[in-house]
């Protein structure tokens, strides 16, 4: 898929705008879609925010009263909203907590860039139907895909 066929709407809350690399987010999305041979054009929205916002979203949409690192909301095909025939296929929304990016990068001993890219890749894979919570085989498949995509981006665990 050509990068021109990938529309990524990256929104970063103001307090993190100076530290979040939106280009890295776009690259991680594109690499994930190319690796999985997704046909374009497609569109994804990504919000980079704080623990409080992600906590609220987690509570509202999943019934979980806790913050988390990444949430994915795949576009359902109920067709309640009619899109023009030439519009990109909307894959869904991802919300990422920058607070978790910082904490987990420190905990795992790698860069914030790698952690951010990991969470983007993880979220996009969920939008594509992958689910590590289905069992050990699915978890191993998803982890292998994540590592391959991060490797293609040049983001090792040590980076």
Curated annotation (Swiss-Prot):
One Pfam family, please name it: YbeY
Q: What is its EC number?
A: 3.1.-.-
Has keyword Metal-binding? yes
Annotated cofactor note: Binds 1 zinc ion.
Q: Which cofactor does it need?
A: Zn(2+)
Q: What is its main location?
A: cytoplasm
Task: Name the residues that bind Zn(2+).
Answer: 122, 126, 132
**Where's it found, cell-wise?**
Cytoplasm
NCBIfam families under this entry? rRNA maturation RNase YbeY (TIGR00043)
Which family does the similarity line name?
Belongs to the endoribonuclease YbeY family.
According to UniProt, the name of this protein is Endoribonuclease YbeY
Source organism (scientific name):
Roseiflexus castenholzii (strain DSM 13941 / HLO8)
Name the gene: ybeY
């Amino acid at each position: 898929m050509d990068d021109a066929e990938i529309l990524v709407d990256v929104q970063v809350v103001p307090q993190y705008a100076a530290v979040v690399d939106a280009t890295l987010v776009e690259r991680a999305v594109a690499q994930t879609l190319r690796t999985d041979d997704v046909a374009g054009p497609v569109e994804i929205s990504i919000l980079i925010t704080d623990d409080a916002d992600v906590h609220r979203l987690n509570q509202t949409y999943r019934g979980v009263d806790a913050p988390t690192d990444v949430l994915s909301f795949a576009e359902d095909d109920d067709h309640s909203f009619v899109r023009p025939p030439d519009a990109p296929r909307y894959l869904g929304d991802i919300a990422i907590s920058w607070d978790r990016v910082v904490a987990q990068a420190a905990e795992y001993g790698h860069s914030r860039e790698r952690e951010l890219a990991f969470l983007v890749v993880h979220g996009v894979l969920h939008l594509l139907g992958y689910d590590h919570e289905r069992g050990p085989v699915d978890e191993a498949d998803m982890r292998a895909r994540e590592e391959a995509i991060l490797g293609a981006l040049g983001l090792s665990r040590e980076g």
